[in-house]
């Protein structure tokens, strides 16, 4: 796994990973496994940025991925420290430089029914830039599709979450789950960046739809390929073509 060197980024996660699901007794007396919701506020240089509702795991990765894919920062090199409190209610991200922000009236941001809210925005959002090309191998897509078909632990238990895989050099290196497809992608991007993986060598596979906001996230992450079992919209396909992002959509999971 090739990595690139990055300035030291300190992570203090006092919350860690909590139980991702629990058993719920249904009216008929049977039990079902249901996912847990966790609410957290993300701050940048002690200024409010986002409120997220997510699964209670990988909060530093979620915060880093969200800032990258929403255009707050251009790279992880800008981040000096990420700190999560013991309750997991607050995620503090400290940058190596001041970042002028403006307080926004609370507004919903895409989160796949997770009540995600933007609390602020950078004065100058990072622009979209063309992504590099990558020679995608058919067997890579088949490997990702098979992994999605097999399912990750939380999905197998609840059938109620989204997944996002990171593939590099034909191998799946990260697999993340969350209540929403946007959160799952942000966690996957955060994992890859913290591991020092070059974005230009990575492929993302999302279990969710691929509208404009998901394509923007992939472009800002710098990945050259986004795979999904769902089809894109006209607008997202046009944006992907404009910036060189390869979309491989309609990769249906086989029924059993």
Q: Which residues make up each language-model segment?
A:
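Feature captures the catalytic cores and cofactor-binding loops of soluble hydro-lyases/lyases
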Residues: 181-256
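Intrinsically disordered, low-complexity regions enriched in acidic/Ser/Thr/Pro/Gln residues
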Residues: 2-168, 174-175
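Protease-associated
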Residues: 160-195
